[in-house]
Amino acid sequence: MARQNRFDRTSFQTQIIDLSHDGRGVARPHGEGDKVTFVTGALPGEVVIVEPVARNRHFDEARVVEVLQASPQRVIPRCSHFGVCSGCVLQHLAEDAQVVSKQRVLLESLERIGRVSPERVLPALAAESWGYRRKGRFSVRWVEKKGRTLVGFREHDPRFVADVSVCHTVVPQVGEKIALLATLLNSLDGRRDVPQIEFIAGDAVVALTVRHLQPLSEADRLALIEFGKEHGIAIFLQSGGVESVRLLWPDEVLLAFRLKPWDVEFVFRPLDFIQINGGLNEKMIAHALDLLGAGFGERVLDLFCGLGNFTLPLARTVDEVVGVEGDIGLVERARENARRNGLGNAEFFVADLTRDQRDAPWMRQGFDKLLLDPPRSGAIEVLKQLPLKMFERIVYVSCHPGSLARDADFLVNEQGFVLRAVGAMDMFPHTAHVESIAVFDRC
């Protein structure tokens, strides 16, 4: 017997009343007291016809079939793959409205989760919104039914790879060559054994890292080399973990970017973490250092420091700065970059900041101010261990408003800090990702 549908999929008309944190429209088709329906492709204020796609206990899900009354903030997406590819979810919303939405998500999270409100809301930071993505990972899949290789980000259904030919958010040296890259991979003997390709761009060099599950034939290696030569792209191969990455072409390459305002250059490896949006990154660093207000005569602690993205610029402006990071490879590069830039007042330590660090040597040092840039999970574990009373000011750079709100609750409502200011930063235009910065002062 054929399985019956579990719910009615009949399309219906509804009005969109809000935008969710993940970029979907919010409707209450059965009235204020009923559960919400999240509608993919809809914007606040619109009247739409939607098709139900899923039903859950606390909410339903649907997609737009037709827009009957469009929002004045609706725009035509630049990308023909929008709506299928999960790389972007907000291309149909005007750019200034995207930033306003992210600022709202940030403030609502602080109030709802953290039970805090800032004394001041900072103007949102924004930079170039197209061709900004200088690091990322494409999924690769040989599809037997299509008889060819697909290269792209995942579809909204993560089981599938979006069949894209170009990506306007990726740096043009890569984003405009996706179709050529797919053709190259399709020609390889080992096309079934390449699950992903990572890209990263420095100031002068763009690199691709080809992950392969089986050794590549000599013909495949030559094909990759020719692609690199033709398009001026460095090619790395990865047969296993991070330590297995090897340069295929050219014989030597230097991946680097420079932060001109502080005259520091960062050398990095192809799988290292760097901030995805280079233009916004420079604005963010300047903003963070200005808000921190640290100068000569002061010592600063920089947690989750990575390559030293904030640490090295700070070293130009303060007496001493200590960076702490859990990735030993990033710490090694941070130390080397400090040496290359002649910054003897920057010291780095390796530490898992989710574990007990109360006996760590850096924990026992005295500091005036704290800057931290944790991952999505936030920094609650290390915040609970720090002697917070020694910090006059804390600047917290966040990539997730929920974890920032939780940590703000701890700092303000348990430790007595004041949330002086907070603001969104549009590190990932056309996505629902919310980067932000917050300033806490000791009372």
Curated annotation (Swiss-Prot):
Q: What is its EC number?
A: 2.1.1.190
MF terms from GO for this chain are: 4 iron, 4 sulfur cluster binding; iron ion binding; RNA binding; rRNA (uridine-C5-)-methyltransferase activity
Sites binding S-adenosyl-L-methionine sit at 275, 304, 309, 325, 352, 373
Ranked from the top, the taxonomy reads: Bacteria, Pseudomonadati, Pseudomonadota, Gammaproteobacteria, Lysobacterales
Q: Which organism is it from?
A: Xylella fastidiosa (strain 9a5c)
- Binding site residues for [4Fe-4S] cluster: 79, 85, 88, 167
Q: Which Gene3D superfamilies match?
A: 2.40.50.1070, Nucleic acid-binding proteins, Vaccinia Virus protein VP39
Name a biological process GO annotation: rRNA base methylation
| Top-level enzyme category | transferase
State the superkingdom: Bacteria
Q: Pfam families in the record, alphabetically?
A: tRNA_U5-meth_tr (PF05958)
Keyword S-adenosyl-L-methionine appears in the UniProt entry: yes
Family to which the UniProt record says this protein belongs: Belongs to the class I-like SAM-binding methyltransferase superfamily. RNA M5U methyltransferase family. RlmD subfamily.
The protein's matches in HAMAP family, at most eight in alphabetical order, are given as: 23SrRNA_methyltr_RlmD
Q: Which reaction does it catalyse?
A: uridine(1939) in 23S rRNA + S-adenosyl-L-methionine = 5-methyluridine(1939) in 23S rRNA + S-adenosyl-L-homocysteine + H(+)
Recorded hits in SUPFAM superfamilies, A to Z, give: Nucleic acid-binding proteins, S-adenosyl-L-methionine-dependent methyltransferases
Q: What is this protein called?
A: 23S rRNA (uracil(1939)-C(5))-methyltransferase RlmD
Active-site residues, as the UniProt record annotates them: 399 (nucleophile)
Q: What does this protein do?
A: Catalyzes the formation of 5-methyl-uridine at position 1939 (m5U1939) in 23S rRNA.
Keyword annotations for this protein? 4Fe-4S, Iron, Iron-sulfur, Metal-binding, Methyltransferase, rRNA processing, S-adenosyl-L-methionine, Transferase
Q: Domain (TRAM): give its ranges.
A: 4-66
